[in-house]
Amino acid sequence: MKKQFTGIVLCSTFAVAGWSLQAKAEEPKEYRSNGLVEFIPNVDPTEPVDPENPDPEKPVKPIDPTDPEGPNPGTQGPLSIDYASSFDFGKNRISNKDQVYFARAQQYQENQKETPNFVQISDNRGTNSGWSLTVTQKEQFKATKATLNSQLTGAQISLANPTVNSNAQNVVKPEATNKIALVPGTASLVAAAKQGTGAGTWATYWGKVEVVAERDETNTVHN
Protein backbone atom coordinates (compact mmCIF):
# COMPACT_ATOMS: atom_id res chain seq x y z
CA MET A 1 0.00 0.00 0.00
CA LYS A 2 1.44 3.33 -1.05
CA LYS A 3 1.89 5.85 1.73
CA GLN A 4 2.08 9.57 1.05
CA PHE A 5 4.14 11.74 3.37
CA THR A 6 3.47 15.39 4.06
CA GLY A 7 6.70 17.19 4.90
CA ILE A 8 9.26 19.76 3.93
CA VAL A 9 12.32 18.61 2.00
CA LEU A 10 14.34 17.09 4.79
CA CYS A 11 17.53 15.11 4.93
CA SER A 12 18.28 13.81 8.39
CA THR A 13 20.55 11.23 9.94
CA PHE A 14 19.91 9.47 13.19
CA ALA A 15 21.23 6.52 15.13
CA VAL A 16 19.20 3.41 14.43
CA ALA A 17 21.31 0.68 15.97
CA GLY A 18 24.22 0.09 18.28
CA TRP A 19 26.04 -3.06 17.34
CA SER A 20 28.02 -4.85 20.07
CA LEU A 21 30.61 -7.57 19.72
CA GLN A 22 32.26 -9.21 22.68
CA ALA A 23 34.66 -12.10 22.98
CA LYS A 24 35.42 -13.90 26.19
CA ALA A 25 37.82 -12.02 28.46
CA GLU A 26 37.94 -9.02 26.11
CA GLU A 27 36.49 -5.53 26.24
CA PRO A 28 33.25 -5.20 24.22
CA LYS A 29 33.55 -3.32 20.94
CA GLU A 30 30.87 -1.00 19.60
CA TYR A 31 30.12 0.29 16.11
CA ARG A 32 27.30 2.73 15.45
CA SER A 33 25.43 2.86 12.12
CA ASN A 34 23.00 5.56 10.97
CA GLY A 35 19.72 5.83 9.09
CA LEU A 36 18.76 8.28 6.35
CA VAL A 37 15.27 9.48 5.42
CA GLU A 38 14.19 12.19 2.99
CA PHE A 39 10.79 13.87 2.66
CA ILE A 40 9.74 15.83 -0.42
CA PRO A 41 6.51 17.69 -1.29
CA ASN A 42 3.84 15.38 -2.70
CA VAL A 43 2.93 16.45 -6.25
CA ASP A 44 0.69 13.47 -7.08
CA PRO A 45 -2.94 14.45 -7.84
CA THR A 46 -5.32 14.02 -4.91
CA GLU A 47 -8.64 12.42 -5.82
CA PRO A 48 -11.94 13.79 -4.48
CA VAL A 49 -13.18 12.33 -1.19
CA ASP A 50 -16.56 12.23 0.52
CA PRO A 51 -16.76 15.71 2.11
CA GLU A 52 -18.79 14.43 5.06
CA ASN A 53 -16.49 11.48 5.72
CA PRO A 54 -13.16 12.30 4.08
CA ASP A 55 -10.85 9.33 3.67
CA PRO A 56 -8.02 9.51 1.09
CA GLU A 57 -8.03 5.70 0.98
CA LYS A 58 -11.66 5.78 -0.25
CA PRO A 59 -11.82 8.27 -3.16
CA VAL A 60 -15.16 9.07 -4.80
CA LYS A 61 -16.27 9.79 -8.37
CA PRO A 62 -18.47 12.90 -8.44
CA ILE A 63 -20.76 13.67 -11.38
CA ASP A 64 -20.67 17.07 -13.08
CA PRO A 65 -24.33 17.91 -13.94
CA THR A 66 -23.19 20.47 -16.52
CA ASP A 67 -20.73 18.26 -18.42
CA PRO A 68 -21.26 14.56 -19.23
CA GLU A 69 -17.51 14.26 -19.88
CA GLY A 70 -16.58 15.96 -16.61
CA PRO A 71 -15.60 16.77 -14.03
CA ASN A 72 -12.44 18.68 -14.81
CA PRO A 73 -9.27 17.22 -13.27
CA GLY A 74 -7.78 18.88 -10.23
CA THR A 75 -4.96 21.40 -10.49
CA GLN A 76 -1.33 20.30 -10.42
CA GLY A 77 1.27 20.76 -7.70
CA PRO A 78 1.62 20.19 -3.96
CA LEU A 79 -0.97 22.92 -3.26
CA SER A 80 -4.00 22.01 -5.34
CA ILE A 81 -7.72 22.44 -5.91
CA ASP A 82 -8.80 18.82 -6.24
CA TYR A 83 -12.48 19.35 -7.01
CA ALA A 84 -15.28 21.92 -6.97
CA SER A 85 -18.97 21.10 -7.46
CA SER A 86 -20.92 22.52 -10.40
CA PHE A 87 -24.36 23.78 -9.38
CA ASP A 88 -27.61 22.47 -10.88
CA PHE A 89 -30.68 24.55 -10.02
CA GLY A 90 -33.07 22.38 -12.05
CA LYS A 91 -35.89 23.55 -14.35
CA ASN A 92 -38.12 26.31 -13.03
CA ARG A 93 -41.17 28.18 -14.28
CA ILE A 94 -40.65 31.78 -15.36
CA SER A 95 -41.95 34.17 -12.71
CA ASN A 96 -42.28 37.94 -12.36
CA LYS A 97 -41.62 37.62 -8.60
CA ASP A 98 -38.39 37.18 -6.70
CA GLN A 99 -37.67 33.48 -6.28
CA VAL A 100 -35.18 31.38 -4.33
CA TYR A 101 -33.88 28.20 -5.96
CA PHE A 102 -31.74 25.62 -4.17
CA ALA A 103 -28.98 23.70 -5.93
CA ARG A 104 -29.36 19.95 -6.20
CA ALA A 105 -27.05 17.83 -4.07
CA GLN A 106 -23.74 16.49 -5.36
CA GLN A 107 -24.28 13.15 -7.09
CA TYR A 108 -21.75 10.36 -7.65
CA GLN A 109 -21.11 7.38 -9.85
CA GLU A 110 -21.61 3.84 -8.54
CA ASN A 111 -24.77 4.73 -6.59
CA GLN A 112 -22.94 6.44 -3.76
CA LYS A 113 -25.07 8.56 -1.45
CA GLU A 114 -25.50 12.22 -2.34
CA THR A 115 -23.63 14.87 -0.37
CA PRO A 116 -23.70 18.65 -0.10
CA ASN A 117 -21.87 20.56 -2.82
CA PHE A 118 -18.24 21.12 -1.90
CA VAL A 119 -14.75 22.22 -2.82
CA GLN A 120 -11.62 20.26 -1.91
CA ILE A 121 -8.11 21.60 -1.29
CA SER A 122 -4.89 19.66 -0.63
CA ASP A 123 -1.75 21.21 0.84
CA ASN A 124 1.13 18.74 0.56
CA ARG A 125 3.94 21.32 0.50
CA GLY A 126 5.13 20.53 4.01
CA THR A 127 5.79 24.19 4.80
CA ASN A 128 2.62 24.93 6.81
CA SER A 129 2.75 28.41 5.32
CA GLY A 130 -1.03 28.73 4.96
CA TRP A 131 -3.25 29.42 1.96
CA SER A 132 -6.43 31.19 0.89
CA LEU A 133 -9.17 30.08 -1.51
CA THR A 134 -11.38 32.49 -3.44
CA VAL A 135 -14.20 32.01 -5.95
CA THR A 136 -15.20 34.28 -8.81
CA GLN A 137 -18.42 34.10 -10.81
CA LYS A 138 -17.18 34.97 -14.28
CA GLU A 139 -20.43 36.47 -15.56
CA GLN A 140 -24.16 36.65 -14.93
CA PHE A 141 -26.38 33.70 -15.86
CA LYS A 142 -27.45 33.88 -19.49
CA ALA A 143 -29.25 31.74 -22.04
CA THR A 144 -27.31 29.49 -24.38
CA LYS A 145 -29.27 31.07 -27.26
CA ALA A 146 -29.66 34.82 -27.74
CA THR A 147 -33.13 36.07 -26.75
CA LEU A 148 -34.68 39.39 -25.75
CA ASN A 149 -34.08 38.59 -22.07
CA SER A 150 -31.12 36.27 -22.44
CA GLN A 151 -29.42 37.45 -19.23
CA LEU A 152 -30.82 36.69 -15.79
CA THR A 153 -30.46 40.21 -14.43
CA GLY A 154 -30.26 40.51 -10.65
CA ALA A 155 -29.71 36.81 -9.98
CA GLN A 156 -27.25 36.03 -7.20
CA ILE A 157 -25.62 32.81 -5.96
CA SER A 158 -25.23 32.48 -2.20
CA LEU A 159 -23.15 29.93 -0.30
CA ALA A 160 -24.05 29.57 3.37
CA ASN A 161 -23.63 27.29 6.39
CA PRO A 162 -20.14 25.98 5.55
CA THR A 163 -18.47 23.01 7.21
CA VAL A 164 -14.71 22.41 6.92
CA ASN A 165 -13.77 18.75 7.18
CA SER A 166 -10.68 16.53 7.01
CA ASN A 167 -9.32 13.27 8.35
CA ALA A 168 -6.09 15.04 9.35
CA GLN A 169 -5.23 14.62 13.01
CA ASN A 170 -3.89 17.30 15.37
CA VAL A 171 -4.15 20.00 12.70
CA VAL A 172 -5.95 23.34 13.14
CA LYS A 173 -8.85 23.72 10.69
CA PRO A 174 -8.91 26.46 8.06
CA GLU A 175 -11.61 29.09 8.56
CA ALA A 176 -14.49 29.33 6.08
CA THR A 177 -16.53 32.44 5.27
CA ASN A 178 -19.93 32.03 6.94
CA LYS A 179 -21.96 33.38 4.00
CA ILE A 180 -20.87 34.31 0.50
CA ALA A 181 -22.95 36.32 -1.97
CA LEU A 182 -21.25 36.12 -5.35
CA VAL A 183 -20.90 39.24 -7.48
CA PRO A 184 -19.95 38.58 -11.13
CA GLY A 185 -16.35 39.55 -11.78
CA THR A 186 -15.46 39.91 -8.10
CA ALA A 187 -13.42 37.42 -6.06
CA SER A 188 -14.95 36.24 -2.77
CA LEU A 189 -13.00 34.54 0.01
CA VAL A 190 -14.17 30.95 0.57
CA ALA A 191 -11.70 29.68 3.17
CA ALA A 192 -8.26 30.52 4.53
CA ALA A 193 -5.58 28.69 6.49
CA LYS A 194 -3.31 30.83 8.64
CA GLN A 195 0.42 30.29 9.02
CA GLY A 196 0.98 26.90 10.61
CA THR A 197 -2.43 25.50 9.61
CA GLY A 198 -4.20 23.91 6.65
CA ALA A 199 -1.85 21.00 5.88
CA GLY A 200 -3.40 17.91 4.32
CA THR A 201 -6.67 17.52 2.41
CA TRP A 202 -9.68 19.68 3.33
CA ALA A 203 -13.25 19.69 2.04
CA THR A 204 -15.53 22.68 2.57
CA TYR A 205 -19.20 21.90 1.98
CA TRP A 206 -22.36 23.97 2.32
CA GLY A 207 -25.59 23.04 4.08
CA LYS A 208 -26.91 19.51 4.24
CA VAL A 209 -28.75 17.14 1.92
CA GLU A 210 -32.54 17.24 2.23
CA VAL A 211 -34.87 14.77 0.50
CA VAL A 212 -37.72 16.73 -1.09
CA ALA A 213 -40.27 16.24 -3.85
CA GLU A 214 -39.20 18.43 -6.75
CA ARG A 215 -41.41 19.34 -9.71
CA ASP A 216 -39.86 20.92 -12.80
CA GLU A 217 -41.59 22.64 -15.73
CA THR A 218 -42.16 19.31 -17.50
CA ASN A 219 -44.25 18.17 -14.48
CA THR A 220 -41.75 15.45 -13.69
CA VAL A 221 -41.38 14.79 -9.98
CA HIS A 222 -37.85 14.18 -8.63
CA ASN A 223 -37.28 12.69 -5.19
Where are the regions a protein language model picked out?
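Signature of Gram-negative chaperone-usher
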Residues: 4-7, 21-223
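Bacterial N-terminal signal peptides
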Residues: 10-17
